[in-house]
Amino acid sequence: MTAKILGSLALFMVASVAQAKGLIMTPPVSSFLITQKFVCQASNNHPTKTAQITVQVVDFNGEVIQEKSVDLAPLASTWTTPLDGGVLNPDLPARCIIKSTNVGSKRLAGTAAIWVDFHVQLAVPAVAVPQ
C-alpha cells in the first residue's frame, strides 16, 4: 500500500514538473500556475494553417487580469508576449491559461491538424547587490 502511494506521488511530481517546463502539451487549453513575471512562447508547426491563440492571466476568482489574442502564422512561426503575471498575492498566485481555438490535440491519419507547442518561462527577478 505504501509503495502504491509513493508511486502515485512520484508520478504526480514528475507530471507537475514536466508541465511547468512546458514539456506536456494539452491543447486546446493549457494552464500554468504563475507566481512571478513570465514569458509565453508558441510555435505553429503547420505548413499552411494559421493557429488562433489567446493567452489570459486570471486570478483564482476567474477574473481576467490580462488577455492577449494573436493569429499565429504557419510554418513554425513564434510569438512571445511579455504578460506581467506579477505576484498578486503570495498566498493567492495567478494562473496563466493558454487557449487555442483551432488546434488539434493529436495528429490523425489523413488530416492536417495544427500543432502548437507552448513554453512558459518564468522571468528571473533582479537581485540587488550590496555596495
Predicted regions and their residues:
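Hydrophobic h-region of N-terminal signal peptides that target proteins for export
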Residues: 11-19
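Gly/Pro-rich, tryptophan- and cysteine-flecked surface segments typical
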Residues: 19-131
